[in-house]
Design a protein with these regions (language model features):
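Residue patterns forming the tRNA-binding/recognition surfaces of aminoacyl-tRNA synthetases
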Residues: 26, 34-35, 39-43, 47, ...
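Conserved oxyanion/phosphate-binding beta-strand-loop segments in alpha/beta enzyme cores
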Residues: 24-60, 88-97, 121-128, 232, ...
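Basic, alpha-helical terminal appendages of large translation-related enzymes
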Residues: 1-3, 9, 15, 19-43, ...
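Conserved active-site neighborhood of enzyme catalytic/cofactor-binding cores
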Residues: 20, 64-95, 197, 328, ...
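N-terminal cofactor/phosphate-binding cores enriched in small/glycine residues
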Residues: 46, 55-120, 127-128
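Short, solvent-exposed turn/loop segments enriched in Gly/Ser/Thr/Pro and often Arg
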Residues: 51-61, 97-106, 146-153, 176-182, ...
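Catalytic alpha/beta core of large soluble enzyme barrels
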Residues: 80, 93, 285-384, 389-390, ...
Length: 748
């Protein structure tokens, strides 16, 4: 749309009498914002007439925490609203909904802390945060609102689980899981950060429990390969790629000397097999205890117990390697040499096979371990074929010539690395293998406040899904909702709810008492917004085809390997069963930076540095806060909050208001200089907007306004065309963007 046409259609008219009257008084944000907010509620500007192309701009919906929103939350919401208005003024019908991620640990922990039932505290918190979000003056469509705790919503969360169960993607397994002793529940690997619970920061331990799992590994290749087609920050794509961790190598079988057992290892460097001088097993390996001899048994059992109390993260980060010799040996299948079998907690049971062959000459960790425990080191790759005398560190160069490797001597390691898997397979003691760091998703939680898992346990039929026409399985009311810590959720104590009949055979059976994690609803909620009142389908195919997927998704980078990965998994599954015709949920992703307290410290109640928007709106107004949130720095970068900044923005708004007020009734002719300034603003701001440089859009508008103030003083006034450009959007009406929403509307 050309600049002239936008200005003609949208710019305020300076000669309008009511506008001149409103402008006559000094800028009073309370009066202005109250008036125009009511006007917008009565006359929405984002209406679907069925003729416009859609643009779906979505925020990551919030947890309804008791502390409400702080200015850091506001930043993402302001950014998304600016972008939504920009698209709206370019002729799109903008889908811009909001909802509540209200099940799970955050809401339940708050309820327990305050002694209030989570249903009550969650409803209260939602009401408070909704009020705060409405204060942003954003164009959210509240008719699309969703709440993950609404039975009409979680009916479909349960439906997805049933479909996954029928597809073989949901299964039950007893296994050692991450256990938070404070939250008293199991955690997925993605919920453990630096060895601690990502919610309460308690040190995570291990606990053997029967768990429901989702087979996200079945989608590992697609999740990894499809990253290439996403317009996402490279940082996020790399984080997901590293988390999935696909590697190519071989599985090799080592027979245990003197026993009818073998140990399978996974290695990405089968070319170095001649250099394998010892083996290390994870303490949790199924053979760990049985490999102990009479002489080593006590030390082995003590080491296994000690390792069980430590998190995987702690084990991987330890600089000091620990271990214990089992007393047993394995046979290197390539050269027949005996290699000692050790246990060490730097090997993880859930990666590869839980056992590794150790080539200390060419791996830093193995070298350190060998030096500490005086194990042999044999170099098998050398630069130019020359062996290093008295190695002081591992030779880890990727390329070199094979030495001390029998028939493989003289081969280039880079070539042998590719050929060795097939050679080993032909020799009969191994096979080619693609491996992944990604593990299946631990999906059940031993908590109350979550979606009941729709499974019935029948003594005869086994695990049976609740029939789809009987969904939702409602979360029952309880008196005691606190976690038990026993490995069972509080639901297990409700006999009248637990005891039921099997849908298959009609005999007495019991309901599953674990609940789903907080990520269950958020993995698909973005689909429901566009058809949130549909009682028969998760989303109709007609609306899915018309309004989905999400075009722009805005939220924090902290969800890179949690929500964002899970949402991609769910979307691919729903695509595969025909619910939607796309397999990626979010076409473009923008991660806004964090607003921190002083000295870059993250805002939190415990630090006492949370800045609430409520008082700022009262003192400075919504527009001043919105503008400062944009001005504070590049939107993708972290920024430190400074109260002096919003004070300066508020003073600037007053100067702008005065500029228009003083010139509203003047019939001043435009000059070459004002035309030049106006056109330059349009060009600069448009370019910056398209590049998402929102902070420089604001600074450019400030610069533009200051030039007009100086020019007004110099030549005695500013012409109407220039004022209309400025007044409409505070960043030029020809940009079709409305940064300072209520002030802009006031100036119409």
């Amino acid at each position: 749309m050309c600049c002239a046409r936008i200005r003609a259609e949208a710019a305020p008219k300076i000669q309008d009498a009511a506008w001149r009257l409103d402008m006559a008084a000094a800028y009073n944000h309370k009066v202005v914002e109250k008036k125009w907010r009511g006007n917008w509620e009565a006359h929405p500007i984002n209406v679907n007439d069925g003729k416009k192309p859609k643009y779906y701009c979505l925020d990551m919906f919030p947890y309804p925490s008791g502390s409400g929103l702080h200015v850091g939350h506001w930043r993402g919401y302001v950014i998304s609203d600016v972008w939504s208005r920009y698209k709206l003024m370019h002729g799109y019908y903008v889908i811009h909904p909001m909802g509540w991620d209200a099940f799970g640990l955050p809401a339940e922990n708050y309820a327990i802390k305050n002694g209030v039932h989570p249903r009550i505290s969650t409803a209260s918190n939602i009401a408070n945060i909704k009020r705060q979000i409405q204060d942003i003056s954003a164009i959210y469509d509240w008719d699309m609102e969703v709440n993950t705790t609404d039975p009409e919503f979680y009916k479909w969360t349960q439906w997805i689980f049933v479909k996954m169960f029928k597809a073989g993607l949901a299964y039950e397994k007893e296994m050692p899981i991450n256990w938070c002793p404070s939250c008293k529940t199991g955690l997925a690997n993605e919920e453990v950060v630096n060895g601690c619970c990502e919610r309460c920061h308690s040190v995570v331990t291990k606990k053997d429990l029967k768990q429901w799992m989702l087979k996200i590994t079945a989608y590992a290749d697609r999740l990894l390969d499809d990253l290439d087609k996403l317009d996402w920050p490279e940082k996020v794509k790399k984080m997901q790629g590293d988390w999935i961790g696909r590697s190519y190598g071989a599985e090799v079988d080592f027979k245990v000397d003197g026993k009818d057992e073998s140990i399978t290892v996974y290695t990405t460097r089968p070319d170095t097999l001649h250099g394998a001088t010892f083996m290390v097993l994870a303490p949790e390996h199924k053979l760990a205890k049985s490999l102990a001899t009479d002489e080593t048994r006590k030390d082995v059992e003590d080491y296994i117990f000690k390792a069980s109390t430590r998190s995987n993260i702690d084990r991987m980060q330890d600089k000091e390697k620990t271990g214990v010799f089992t007393g047993s040996y394995a046979i290197n299948p390539l050269n027949g040499k005996k290699v000692p079998i050790w246990l060490s907690d730097y090997v993880l049971a859930d990666y590869g096979t839980g056992a590794i062959m150790c080539v200390p000459a060419h791996d830093d960790r193995d070298f350190e371990f060998a030096k500490k425990f005086n194990l042999p080191i044999i170099q098998v790759i050398a630069k130019d074929g020359k062996e290093i005398e008295n190695m002081t560190e591992a030779y880890t160069e990727a390329a070199g010539t094979m030495i001390n490797s029998g028939d493989w001597n003289g081969m280039e390691s880079s070539v042998l690395k590719k050929e060795a898997p097939e050679m080993i397979e032909k020799m009969g003691f191994g096979k080619k293998k693609v491996n992944y760091k990604l593990r299946d998703w631990v999906f059940s939680r031993q908590r109350y406040w979550g979606e009941p898992i729709p499974i019935i346990h029948c003594p005869d039929c086994g695990c049976v899904p609740v029939p789809e026409d009987q969904l939702p399985v409602l979360l029952p009311e309880v008196e005691k909702y606190e976690p038990t810590g026993t490995g069972e959720s509080p639901l297990a104590a409700i006999d009248e709810w637990v005891n039921t009949t099997c849908p298959c055979c009609g005999k007495p059976a019991k309901r599953e008492t674990n609940t789903m994690p907080q990520w269950a609803g958020s993995s698909w909620y973005f689909l429901r917004y566009v058809d949130n009142k549909n009682k028969d389908e998760l989303v109709s195919r007609e609306k899915a085809d018309k309004y989905l997927p999400v075009d722009m998704y805005i939220g924090g980078v902290e969800h890179a390997v949690l929500h964002l990965l899970y949402s991609r998994f769910y979307t691919k599954f729903l695509h595969d069963i025909g619910v939607v015709d796309f397999d990626e949920p979010f076409t473009k992703l923008f991660n806004q930076g964090m607003i921190t307290g002083k000295n870059g410290i993250k805002m939190s109640k415990s630090m006492g540095n949370v800045v609430s928007p409520d008082d700022l709106i009262e003192d400075y107004g919504c527009d001043a806060l919105r503008m400062y949130e944009l001005f504070v720095g590049p939107p993708e970068m972290d920024a430190e909050w400074d109260d002096r900044g919003i004070d300066g923005v508020r003073r600037f708004l007053g100067r702008f208001w005065n500029l228009v007020t003083e010139n509203a009734d003047k019939n001043f002719a435009e000059t070459a200089e004002t035309v030049k300034i106006r056109h330059k603003l349009v060009y600069d701001i448009t370019t910056r907007l398209e590049n998402f440089n929102l902070n420089t859009v604001v600074s450019g508008f400030m610069e533009y306004t200051n030039k007009l103030i100086d020019l007004s003083k110099k030549q005695g006034g500013i012409d109407k065309a220039t004022l209309e450009t400025a007044a409409f959007s505070k960043a030029a009406s020809t940009l079709a963007i409305n940064f300072l929403t209520s002030t802009s509307a006031k100036l119409k």
